[in-house]
Amino acid sequence: IPSNNLGKGLQNDTVKAYIYKRNRSNKQEADIVEIIERDKTSFVGVLQLSKNFGFVVADDFKMYTDIFVAKNKLKDAEDGVKVLVKITDWPANSKTPFGEILEILGMPGDHETEIHSILLEYGLPYKFPENVEAEAGLIPLTISQNEIDKRRDMRNETTFTIDPKDAKDFDDALSFKVLENGNYEIGIHIADVSHYVEEKTNLEEEAYNRATSVYLVDRVVPMLPEVLSNGVCSLRPNEEKLTFSSIFEINNKAHVVNEWFGRTVIYSDKRFAYEEAQEIIETKGNTISEEISITGESYTVQPEIVTAILTLQELAKKLRKKRLQQGAITFDRVEVKFNLDENAEPVGVFFKESKDANKLIEEFMLLANRKVAEFIGSKKGVETKNTFIYRVHDEPNLDKLMALQSIVSKFGYSNKIDLKNKQTTSSSLNKLLEDVHGKGESNMIETLAVRSMSKAVYTTQNIGHYG
């Protein structure tokens, strides 16, 4: 479609087009003859002000035209500021659309201005509607005895959370108990959001529209208002919380002997950062040093929690070993993180490495997910009540694996990927990733290996999970 035939169509609009062949060529061209539905009408951009009007130059490079704003629609915005503008009309005889300024964001380059620009550009609302906030404000902050009586009471079990040091909300927790027979009772708990967010409410509709929380470098755009995300649904220490739990009896070989799934009430004894839990694992001691402590002061951890972390670490290693033997593929990609000053400006960069404390949490979350899927998947019949959404990974793309083989051979890793069957493919991939670990080419090869995998899909069809 040539630029002069766009017919006022913008990126991702639904349009009606007249298709024809070019003269002296079999190539097809099209004219857009009707805009059926606009995908987007609001844009972030910089205002260029004249005496009686202004133009907004959009940040989105795919927005090929400026937006004209009449003087009475400028909202007293000054020249050169970033604004949010909405297209209100596009007269037939005008080359540019007409619009009005909805919001003045600030000066380009300013941290808060740019963050809000990103949020608005991608349609990520950082404010909740008043009716949603009002509904959230009615949620009780205490738990009734009547609700506790309906649940399995886990408040007396040793329980803790391990999260990034800058985390504001704590979604999951682990509990630990040694049973009389020598086995371990391990609970994996997540906040029971469904208790607070009921169907056909403003809260549920807003959460549905947002779909997920969005994590930026210096903040989170939550799916739920703060009273939920950082309050009643955050498993903060020294507070009773409603949770949904997977509870396993596990022996010292990391074999699951018994399992239970259901609603619980817990009481977290302690909140750890990954670095603090890692220090316990490495030193096998109960002292968190001043340099590692998120409080900035050295402190002592209760002996029962130290025992729990060290035992869970040994079980996690055994669970991981079993997964790899069964064909799981493990990617330890380096993640780049930023150090921010008090104004949220980046002052440094570092590489985030996944250590034993991270892998401990990962293993038990994987165990809970896998066992829940197996439990539901083993139910017979096709009744609607047993319908379940699975996260599945199809087999990797063979062409991409062969391309990966070709690339790694140039680094001296010839014949490293054995494509004979699923087991040989996964085991040889793991061996390759192990061989490249810590080398200059490791991040590139791991990235290519990840891209050769099929993307995760959420479906009611349980086709299995590769790796």
Regions found by a protein language model. Give the residues of each.
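S1/OB-fold single-stranded RNA-binding interface
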Residues: 1-161, 165-173, 179, 183-187, ...
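Electropositive polyanion-binding surfaces
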Residues: 84, 90-91, 117-124, 131-467
